[in-house]
Amino acid sequence: MIMHRNNKFPSKNNLERRSAHASRGSRVTSSFIHGAESSKHSNFRHSPSLPYQTNQFPTKLLLIILVIIACIIMITVALQNCSLAREYNWENLQYENGRIFYSENGTITSLTGIDVSSHQGTIDWNAVSQDGIDFAMIRCGTRGYTEGSLFADETFYTNADGAQTAGIPFGVYFFSQAINEQEAIEEAEYVLELIQGMEISCPIAFDLEDMPSYNARANDLSAEQITANAEAFCNRIKQAGYEVMIYGNQHDLSRYDLEHLNEEIWYAEYNGTQPTTSIPLVMWQYTSTGSVSGISTNVDLNILFDANLVHAN
């Protein structure tokens, strides 16, 4: 058999080299095929309709919902603060026969009220109702300056019955000397007991005044404690379904941390023209020497800027 020189059997070394080359070729081919498969699967994973991207959608939706809820909460708080931060144009105040009114577009929008206690003695409420009085704030009780006992105002029931019979809407106020939240809640419970069964048509007010002449038990409380007491009182009253107010003059109210006390303010200042405070207020007690038919003594007069706080009987 004739063998061509070029077709001679390969040597052992040539066989080993060819085997190694074939092995490398096999690995290259395998890598190419595996790479193509990987590329195909990789492209599939990055497709817009990929399963793992679909799983991210609920997370993104949840984040959007949380952002929307946070925005709603912030807007609600802002609106609440705006409702308390009332602004008035004092040029709209009108003065007539010792009384002050507030008008908008030529129409009187305010209400005129009195606040009374045992200091006014016996009151002819029918005569009061005929003298342009729209509502009354009646003192229902007090806490003692020193020992801290609770007392009902001795004319409270008579005044409440008289106002109700005469058709005058009324609220009540309590003179507080609470030194902690527990006592403030006790005062609120006492008020609720006193007004049980009555038609309370106006807010219930928390009245804490500085009494330096009497060395009163609540004189030296911190702003933090006074604010906590007021909130405890107001929260209990609101739980019972009533609206609330905080009463005081500039000095009294400066004792509170008003940034953390989001209640309506009943402000006292007797300058006879307009309030000079920057404190947001809804009612202004503008004199302690008012004259009203049916009351033999001087009486406090008030202008209520938000008539919605008085509910007809």
For each of these PLM feature ranges, what is it?
Residues 237-254:
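Aromatic-lined carbohydrate-recognition surfaces of secreted/lumenal glycan-active proteins
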